[in-house]
Amino acid sequence: MNNKILFLIVCLNAFFIEAQTSMEAKKLLENVSKQIESYDNIKFEFNYVLNNRKEQINQESKGEITVAGDLYKLDFLEATQLYDGKSLHTIIPENEEITITTPEEGADFGINPTALLHFYKEGYDYQWDITQRIEGKKIQFIKLIPTEEDAEILSILIGIDVSRKHIFRIIEVGINGTYTTLTINDMKVNTPLLEDYFVFDKKKYPDYYIND
């Protein structure tokens, strides 16, 4: 009887500890989201790595993002995306082509920078993961596990700079063994921007084909 009671106590303790760490993980993510939303704008460079050892794939790219509310400018994979709140303009200099879409239609192009603030709020369970010191920063990782059985990813690790409450790194692990890593570098906040910074100016691209 004593062994059964002890086993039950251990199980209950494990349950409550897991629930507590899950709440702590969610609270930290919410604090990060509030911190970033408090800025007029954010601008940062990033490194993007796609790796799959089985398929012998290792791709590295760099990019830059400026976000102000729902507006953003994204330079990534030799293309520029401008979202002015209504239309998404994808500018590809190599092809001298510009595609105009709605955000929903253009969502498959790559990443939506504004989604970094909110994507974790639905569809995931939370776990308090490892703490690492990277580049002199204390980085606390939060593990997100999809609640849907048919999800295409196993987990997402979000590394948070504890002192600044900024996202430092996001690691997505796919069910096919693909690791996608986004590392944020050189973040600047409340940078003075021109009023038309996110506005597409057709005059700058006189010879481009516009597909709308």
Segments (PLM) and residue ranges:
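N-terminal secretory signal peptides that target proteins for export/translocation
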Residues: 1-2
